[in-house]
C-alpha cells in the first residue's frame, strides 16, 4: 500500500490505490526496481509486459483489497470486537486492549486505522496465534459501513456515541 514501507519485496503485494489526491500506479516502476513481484492495478501499463512480475487488473483496487482482507478474516474463528461511533473509538479500543491483553493474545487496529483503507490494513494483521480481535471502524459517508463491516465481521459490537462529527457526509 505504501511504497515507502516495502520491507519484504519478494513477499509483498502492492495495491495501486487511487484517490482524489493520489494515484498508486505511479509507484509501480519504483517498486519493480525494489523487487516487488505482485501488483493489483486498475490501470495497466504496456511497459510492464516484459517485467518478471504478476499483475492482477481489477476495476477497483480498493474493493479488491477489501475483498481479499474480508476473505482473510473468514479464516479466523475468534471473538472480534468492532467499535464505532462519532467519537471515542480509539480510546475505547486501547482501554479494551489494556484490560484484555493480559488474558488473551490480542490483535488491534494500530493508531486510528479506522477508514476504508485502515480497516483492511488492520485486519490483514490477524494471525493464527491471535485469540481476540479489537478493531475500530469510522464512517463519514452514507453506506460506508457496508464496505467496512464485512471486513471486521465483529462478533461483539460497541457503539460509542452519535454526535455531529463527520455529519457533512450524511447530508
Positions of PLM-derived features:
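N-terminal leader/targeting and accessory segments in enzymes
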Residues: 1-67
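Phosphate-binding loop of NTP-binding sites
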Residues: 63-171
Amino acid at each position: 500500500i505504501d511504497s515507502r514501507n516495502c520491507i519484504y519485496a519478494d513477499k509483498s503485494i502492492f495495491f495501486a490505490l487511487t484517490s482524489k489526491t493520489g494515484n498508486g500506479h505511479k509507484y509501480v516502476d519504483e517498486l519493480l526496481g525494489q523487487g516487488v513481484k505482485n501488483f493489483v492495478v486498475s490501470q495497466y501499463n504496456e511497459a510492464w509486459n516484459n517485467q518478471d512480475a504478476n499483475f492482477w487488473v481489477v476495476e477497483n483496487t480498493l474493493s479488491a483489497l477489501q475483498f481479499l482482507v474480508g476473505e482473510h478474516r473468514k479464516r479466523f474463528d475468534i471473538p472480534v470486537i468492532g467499535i464505532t461511533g462519532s467519537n471515542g473509538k480509539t480510546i475505547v479500543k486501547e482501554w479494551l486492549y489494556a484490560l484484555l491483553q493480559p488474558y488473551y493474545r490480542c490483535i488491534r487496529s494500530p493508531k486510528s486505522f479506522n477508514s476504508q483503507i485502515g480497516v483492511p490494513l488492520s485486519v490483514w494483521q490477524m494471525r493464527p496465534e491471535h485469540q481476540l480481535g479489537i478493531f475500530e471502524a469510522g464512517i463519514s459517508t452514507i453506506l460506508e459501513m457496508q464496505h467496512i463491516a464485512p471486513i471486521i465481521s465483529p462478533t461483539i459490537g460497541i457503539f460509542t456515541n452519535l454526535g455531529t462529527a463527520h455529519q457533512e457526509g450524511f447530508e
